[in-house]
Curated annotation (Swiss-Prot):
GO terms for molecular function: 4 iron, 4 sulfur cluster binding; metal ion binding; rRNA (adenine(2503)-C2-)-methyltransferase activity; rRNA binding; tRNA (adenine(37)-C2)-methyltransferase activity; tRNA binding. The lineage of its organism: Bacteria, Pseudomonadati, Pseudomonadota, Gammaproteobacteria, Candidatus Pseudothioglobaceae. [4Fe-4S] cluster binds at C112, C116, C119. This is Dual-specificity RNA methyltransferase RlmN. Disulfide bonds join C105-C337. S-adenosyl-L-methionine binds at G162, E163, S194, S216, L217, H218, N294.
Amino acid sequence: MNKKNLLSFNQNALNDFFVGLGEKPYRTKQIMQWIYKDHEFDFEKMLNFSKSLRDELSKVVCVELLRVVKQNFILDGVIKWVLALDKNNHIEMIYIPEKNRGTLCISSQVGCGLACTFCSTGMQGFNKNLTTAEIIAQVLIASRYLNSKTKRISNVVFMGMGEPLLNEHAVYNACDLLLDDLAFGLSRRKVTISTSGVVPAMLRMSERTPVSLAVSLHASDDHLRNELVPINQKYSLEELLKACKVYLQAGTQKRHILFEYVMLKGVNDSIEHANKLVKLLKGISAKINLIPFNSFEKTQYQTSSAQTIEKFQNILYHQGIRTMTRRTRGEDIGGACGQLAGKVLDKTKRTYDRRH
């Protein structure tokens, strides 16, 4: 009998589960305390449950994390974990500490099927969607370790391996737990889903979860974005920006969208590109994150110079667009933006296509 992993259950699902066992719904609060606050996963040690309930839980459900294959550290506090789903598939996550916050960057898929040309994950191909349990296991592994070091996770971003909006059900259930005070208790502004532009899912997102939205933009016209972000061939910039406006109008609180823009030398970093970007985002509550390109094996791209990035940023800033340049961290352990690769049994055969 395959046991269900309780990490896949949000609060409502846990209520239904316990009622199905003939228990009162208050058991949900008790077990969430054990799992998410006390980091206790052994039912036999949950002594506010009767022996018969502990035995029943052991028969039908489990609490299983992922196996930590490797944990890398660098001097400025960045940590990268490599986690095994099975012998063929590994995922990666990154913890980035800053003065007033600690951000955990987690994965939503094994590999990625979107093939963005500047991204190491996209070059690996795709194997599978992660389950809610596999997503939440990442956060539990990190929080359990960081708590022992008196560090904290204040922000969670779906910016690791995979396209979150091609795994909606699991990602939204995970967001329920990230926001739930009985689990991780993060605010909606502290959880961010980053998409390359899966427009139908973007239109559904506001109906399902109130978390923040980031868009991997990287170009200011369809011709260039078709090349850099191939999903643009299916959903154009016009469609993408319409979906962004729907998201902004749906919230009861004032929102903005974070647009991510990787800086590629001689590709998308000219003054003309900056001016076109200003025009493109006119009328949208936007914040732009300029990302120096992080190199990986066999890439055709180089990063823009610091002077070019500064000039680009100044153009946006003087046109009233909030703009920041991401500090590159974790590059020496393959943990910088666009470098997460893990280990993927590629079902798309993209790695084969690149070799032949």
